[in-house]
A protein has these predicted regions:
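Non-catalytic, surface beta->alpha helical segment in thiol-disulfide oxidoreductase systems
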Residues: 88-113
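Local sequence-structure signature of Cys/Sec-based thiol-disulfide redox active-site neighborhoods
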Residues: 18-59
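N-terminal G-site of the GST-like fold
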Residues: 43, 53-82, 88
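N-terminal targeting signals for export/organelle localization
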Residues: 1-13
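Short amphipathic alpha-helices and their capping/turn residues within compact interaction modules
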Residues: 27, 31, 54, 79, ...
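Folded extracytoplasmic luminal domains of secretory or organellar precursors
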Residues: 15-18, 67, 98
Length: 113
């Protein structure tokens, strides 16, 4: 019973195949946003990026078959377990507040263009 309860809080290690798939997504997209469709911070992120460029990729973790595993892989790779999880030019940016801070400092547009 204890192992079952523990499984709610501890995810098993992510397979190398899933990690490779996530890395491939990061490497093949200039702007990549992992998000959940119901998340208001994710909507803010999409709106801001859309205002700068139409060229970005979104992965909706809550509708993806491997969404939970992908989110676990992202946590292992970046230390971030929340969404949105944003990458620009293969660099991990962080979440919406990090993106908004870059915009406020005038540093986002040069990254996107």
């Amino acid at each position: 019973m204890l192992e079952y309860i523990k499984s709610w809080f501890v995810s098993p290690p992510v397979s190398p195949v899933i990690r490779a798939e996530v890395q491939n997504l990061i490497d093949s997209n200039k702007i990549l946003i992992f998000l959940k469709s119901y998340c208001p911070y994710c909507d803010s992120t999409k709106d801001l990026i859309k205002s700068l460029t139409p060229d970005f990729k979104v992965v909706e973790l809550d509708t993806s078959v491997n969404g939970r595993t992908i989110q676990d892989a992202l946590r292992e790779m970046t230390g971030q377990s929340t969404v949105p999880n944003i990458f620009i030019n293969r660099k991990h940016i962080g979440g919406n507040s990090d993106l908004q801070a870059l915009q406020g400092a005038g540093k986002l547009k040069p990254l996107v263009n």
